[in-house]
Amino acid sequence: MSMFHPYYVGVAEINWETGKKFDVSLKLITDDLQTAIYKSQKVKFKSSQKNNANQVALSKYVNNYFKVYISGLKKENIQVPLNFIGWEVEEEATWIYLESASAKYYKKENHISIENKLLYNVLEKQVQIIHCNRNGVRKSDQVIQPDFQVSFEY
C-alpha cells in the first residue's frame, strides 16, 4: 500500500506537429486512478497487470474523461479521435499513452482545447497541469476542479 500523498496533481503532455499525429502522455497517481476506474465502472483496475480487461477499463475511462478539440479557419471544435496505446507504472504514478491517427487534415487549425476531468470523479481538489507543444512552441496552463478546460492559440 502506498503512503498518503498530500497532492492531487495530474499532468497531460500533448505534442502536435502540423500534418502529423497528436501524441498524448498522461501522468496520474496510480491509487487514485484505480479508485476512479472502480467508481466509474465497478471494475478493479490493476495497473501492474497488463491484460485485456485492464486495457479496456483504462481506455474507456480515459476516453470518457479526456478530450482534445481543435478549430481554425473553417472548422470549429472538431474532436480529435485519440487511440489508446498503452500504459506503464513509474513508482506511484501511471503513465498513459494516446495518439491520433494521421493529423494531415489538421494543418490549418490554430486553436486547441483540452478537456481534462481525469480523477474528478474521486478527488475534489484535483489539479491538472496541461502542456501543449506545437511545432516546437510549448504552452502550459493548469485547471483546478471544478474547471476542466484549457485552450491555447498558435
Annotated model-derived regions:
Residues 3-154:
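N-terminal soluble domains immediately following signal/targeting peptides that reside
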